[in-house]
């Protein structure tokens, strides 16, 4: 019997049943109808959607129809900055950049240094804020321009958020947040108040533009509890409901359902050097057989293999990915060769990303929302 999985904004444990999780949260499956509507306006479908990394949503169809009527909307996502960024963190951001480019809309990106300070007993506030600035480099490195990307570091850019957060907080009862997030009598009040701030950004574009400006939030599905609450109270506060687009977690190199910051070998970080990347991929769990002879005779299982999972992330060519899949299943492709192919793809991506990341180092303040509003 499979271990029962646990998914909260702060913890993912066990092998996640994504269909069951979607049903538990009450989200909707991403169907061909929504994908076709997206393609109608974007002109194409991003591989992350085409290959099923994004699989559930709330009102994606509604915000696309809103777009079709020529009405304004925005994108919103965020990051809890507690350490360096790994590839799994970047999946929603890559789609975020694509959506911004295709639809020409602004992006609001929240760095929740306060949340990470509240959540981690060992975390100093200054450390969380330092990581917010460091992680911002990874977002900027994706190619955003200051007119399209608005960074919000909670402890530094609170002024435009706080009036909205106050209204949100007044609508949320202790019983509601306790039931939604599993808070207990020992939960500190910072963490109890924090959902008001994450919800507030969903309403911020409407305040700044002075007219209804709903947001679409691409993020991992563990963030759904925040935005369920946001949708519950939005209209009573005079704001449009936020729409969401949910991704699965990126499989850990060790074979678990999700990469873990507590195990550096489970993930590839954007600051890893080539030697480290090579070692991590070489040591990665695979769906291969114990010996090359067995692999050739019986074939491998790419469906449980993080190496194949990463090929799906980093290879934009559907025919190439399909060839890897069938070559593994047939035994024609051995794990060592497959890992070497993946290493070359990731090495190239990380090298280019690191160069862009360093160029962004003295530009963070130009992207911060508060610097544009002052």
From Swiss-Prot:
Intracellular or extracellular location(s): Cytoplasm
Motif ('KMSKS' region): 258-262
Gene3D superfamilies: HUPs (3.40.50.620), Tyrosyl-Transfer RNA Synthetase (1.10.240.10)
Annotated catalysed reactions: tRNA(Trp) + L-tryptophan + ATP = L-tryptophyl-tRNA(Trp) + AMP + diphosphate + H(+)
InterPro entries: aa-tRNA-synth_I_CS, aa-tRNA-synth_Ic, Rossmann-like_a/b/a_fold, Trp-tRNA-ligase, Tryptophan-tRNA-ligase_arc
GO cellular component: cytoplasm
NCBIfam families for the chain: PRK12285.1-4, trpS
Family assignment from sequence similarity: Belongs to the class-I aminoacyl-tRNA synthetase family.
Protein name in the entry: Tryptophan--tRNA ligase
């Amino acid at each position: 019997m499979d271990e029962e999985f646990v998914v909260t904004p702060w913890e993912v444990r066990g092998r996640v049943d994504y269909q069951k999780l979607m049903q538990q949260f009450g989200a909707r499956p991403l169907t061909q109808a929504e994908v076709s509507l997206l393609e109608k306006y974007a002109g194409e479908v991003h591989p992350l959607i085409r290959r099923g990394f994004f699989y559930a949503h709330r009102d994606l169809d509604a915000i696309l129809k809103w777009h079709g009527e020529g009405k304004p909307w925005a994108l919103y996502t965020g990051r809890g900055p507690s350490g360096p960024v790994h590839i799994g963190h970047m999946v929603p951001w890559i789609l975020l950049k694509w959506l911004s480019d295709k639809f020409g809309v602004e992006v609001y990106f929240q760095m929740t240094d306060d949340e990470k300070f509240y959540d981690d007993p060992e975390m100093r506030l200054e450390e969380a804020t330092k990581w917010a600035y460091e992680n911002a480099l990874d977002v900027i490195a994706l190619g955003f321009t200051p007119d399209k990307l608005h960074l919000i570091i909670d402890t530094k850019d609170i002024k435009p958020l706080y009036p909205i957060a106050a209204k949100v907080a007044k609508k949320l009862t202790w019983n509601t947040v306790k039931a939604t997030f599993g808070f207990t009598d020992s939960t500190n009040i910072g963490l109890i108040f924090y959902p008001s701030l994450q919800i507030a950004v969903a309403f911020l574009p409407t305040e700044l533009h002075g007219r209804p400006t709903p947001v679409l939030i691409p993020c991992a599905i563990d963030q759904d509890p925040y935005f369920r609450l946001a949708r519950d109270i939005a209209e009573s506060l005079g704001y449009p409901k936020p729409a969401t687009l949910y991704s699965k977690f990126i499989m850990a190199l060790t074979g678990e359902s999700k990469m873990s910051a507590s195990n550096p070998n489970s993930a590839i970080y954007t600051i890893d050097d080539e030697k480290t990347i090579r070692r991590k991929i070489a040591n990665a769990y695979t769906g291969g057989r114990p010996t090359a002879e067995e692999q050739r005779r019986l074939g491998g299982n790419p469906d449980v293999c993080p190496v194949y999972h990463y090929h799906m992330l980093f290879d934009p060519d559907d025919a190439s990915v399909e060839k890897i899949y069938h070559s593994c299943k047939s035994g024609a492709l051995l794990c060592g060769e497959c890992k070497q192919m993946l290493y070359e793809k990731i090495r190239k991506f990380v090298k280019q990303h690191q160069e862009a990341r360093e160029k962004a180092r003295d530009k963070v303040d130009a992207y911060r929302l508060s610097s544009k509003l002052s």
